[in-house]
Curated annotation (Swiss-Prot):
Catalytic activity: a ribonucleoside 5'-phosphate + H2O = a ribonucleoside + phosphate
Pfam short name (any one): SurE
Taxonomic lineage: Archaea, Methanobacteriati, Methanobacteriota, Stenosarchaea group, Methanomicrobia
GO molecular function, one term: metal ion binding
InterPro entries referenced in this protein's UniProt entry, alphabetically: SurE (IPR030048), SurE-like_Pase/nucleotidase (IPR002828), SurE-like_sf (IPR036523)
EC number: 3.1.3.5
Entry GO CC: cytoplasm
Name used for this protein in its record: 5'-nucleotidase SurE
Source organism of this protein record: Methanospirillum hungatei JF-1 (strain ATCC 27890 / DSM 864 / NBRC 100397 / JF-1)
Bound cofactor: record note: Binds 1 divalent metal cation per subunit.
UniProtKB keywords: Cytoplasm, Hydrolase, Metal-binding, Nucleotide-binding
Cofactor(s), by name: a divalent metal cation
């Protein structure tokens, strides 16, 4: 297996060698997800792909870590392919791959997630994006791929009926990763967040994050004893400003959003200095 060195932590234009690359593949839907294996199918012919993913469904856990319980890794097989199944979260999977299993990837790919990861909301809650951010924080360029699901109930259904959509998505994964390997990872970017519409009618669009993906709501129900319990639920946002990831997906374009780990609000520093009389 060909190993690559991690890039400098400073965002820069990362170039790749001409050797067969090593790609670490993970996700948050679990090691048995059809989306994960669609990504594998897109990559394995021209890259050494190491699969290390959660053993179970871990959607919406963001970049959380398992620090109060031990982590176990088992090997699982899919045909003649061996993968690592981690009894933890997506971020745990990345950390164990890098620091326990000795994987030295040239690039980390997270996905294909079943369901879009758009807007401020998804970036901070998505386990798919969280895994990519974790890899980037350790110096590895990372790409998160997600497929739009118009009916959110499909998120947790048997995904085999999405085979036709995964076929198109595999082409996107293959093209995006080949472009990166041939031309280099973009400067000042830690993670590329790629969202694929359920039906592609346009091309690539470079976007920025919308504010919302969902209209947040809470559904109250009663258990058999009359005690209330709640589901956090709500419909998808139907539109967003031009140039945002949500708007691009609604147009049928493939949204590519550059993400950085630096969450500092630089534009707010002057107001903070005035607030604390530091001018």
């Amino acid at each position: 297996m060909i190993s690559g060195s991690p890039p400098d932590s400073t965002p820069s234009h990362h170039h790749f060698s001409l050797k067969r690359p090593c790609i670490l593949l993970t996700n948050d839907d679990g090691v048995n997800s059809e989306g994960l294996w669609a990504a594998y199918d897109a990559l394995f012919e021209w890259a050494d792909v190491v699969v290390c993913a959660p053993a179970t469904q871990q959607s919406a856990v963001g970049r959380s870590l398992s620090i109060f319980e031990p982590l176990r890794v088992n090997t699982v097989s899919r045909g003649d392919i061996t993968a690592y199944a981690v009894g933890g979260k997506p971020t745990d999977s990345v950390i164990l791959a890098l620091f326990a299993l000795g994987v030295k990837p040239d690039l980390v790919v997270s996905g294909i997630n079943i369901g879009e990861n758009l807007s401020y909301e998804a970036i901070t809650t998505s386990g798919t994006v969280g895994a990519a951010l974790e890899a980037a924080n350790h110096g590895y360029p990372a790409v998160a791929f997600s497929l739009q699901i118009e009916d959110q109930k499909e998120k947790f259904d048997d995904a085999r009926h999405l085979a036709d959509r995964f076929s198109e998505s595999k082409g996107v994964v293959r093209d995006v990763i080949r472009r990166i390997l041939e031309k280099g990872f973009p400067s000042f970017t830690h993670v590329m967040n790629v969202n694929i519409p359920s039906i592609i009618t346009g091309g690539y669009e470079i976007t920025h994050l919308a504010e919302h993906l969902f209209i947040t709501g809470v559904e109250k129900r009663l258990d058999p004893r009359g005690k209330p319990y709640y589901w956090i639920n709500g419909p998808l946002v139907t539109d967003a400003p031009e140039g945002t990831d949500v708007h691009a997906i609604h147009k049928g374009n493939i949204s590519i959003t550059p993400i950085t780990l630096d969450c500092t609000a630089y534009a707010g520093t002057d107001d903070l200095r005035r607030l604390f009389s530091l001018e």
